[in-house]
Design a protein with these regions (language model features):
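N-terminal FAD-binding dinucleotide-binding subdomain shared by FAD-dependent oxidases/monooxygenases
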Residues: 3-223
Length: 223
């Protein structure tokens, strides 16, 4: 049995991970130069099939169709952020995206009370806090062996020898997993094969493609 003690809801979008077909691999490899060029011009630094239209210039039907395509058909993940060109610049466009995802949460989570706990509040604009990317995250809360506790409504008061107590009552637990996050920006001593560290490697300047990045986005850096 799993009990999730939930504080603040963030937006989560489906990863849509799937095996790459030979046709997909061939298409990507045939367009490496084009994808690199598009990535250099993208605000994210990577090619995410951006839509150049505003969310305000299309009909409600076309807007919903584009969001659905990003949610299920465009590879999922961060591609939701590129559904329209003004999601992170126009409050109304952003609200459309946020309302779409909240609608997906309410449609997926069968218990209305759980769904509302999992819905990000209106004071969190879509995409302004790093998106979570998941595989069946919201569906998990439909399982009989998964409970959800809102610790904003019922704060944790103490850890006991047998579990955890909130203002609502005591929860018997075998294991407590602390989801307190991690420090992604703390300096780390990274050495090259010849034992030189990063400051030494940058003595004569730094060369990169489009910018610098570290932490959890470091994998996107070009050498």
């Amino acid at each position: 049995h799993l009990t999730v003690f939930h504080r603040t809801a963030n937006f989560s979008v489906p990863a849509q991970n799937e095996p790459l077909t030979e046709a997909t691999l061939a298409h990507v490899k045939a367009h490496y130069a084009e994808r690199r060029a598009l990535g250099r011009e993208a605000v994210t630094g990577v090619f995410l099939s951006a839509n150049d239209k505003s969310a305000l210039e299309v009909s409600d039907e076309d807007r919903l169709k584009e969001f659905e395509f990003r949610w299920r058909g465009a590879g999922g993940g961060f591609r939701m952020l590129r559904a329209f060109n003004d999601l992170l610049r126009n409050p109304i466009a952003n609200q459309y995206a946020g309302d779409f995802v909240r609608g997906k949460i309410r449609a997926t989570v069968k218990d209305p009370a759980k769904a509302e706990i999992l819905c990000p509040k209106p004071d969190l604009p879509f995409g302004t806090k790093r998106l979570c990317v998941d595989t069946h995250y919201y569906e998990t809360f439909n399982r009989d062996n998964v409970d959800l506790v809102d610790v904003k409504a019922h704060p944790i008061t103490e850890i006991t020898p047998t579990g955890l107590r909130t203002t609502q009552g005591h929860h018997e637990l075998d294991v407590i997993v602390f989801a307190t996050g991690f420090d992604a920006h703390q300096a780390e001593r990274i050495e090259a094969f010849d034992a030189r560290n990063l400051p030494q490697l940058g003595t004569h300047g730094i060369r990169q493609v489009g910018g610098q990045a570290g932490g959890h986005v470091g994998r996107h850096c070009a050498q």
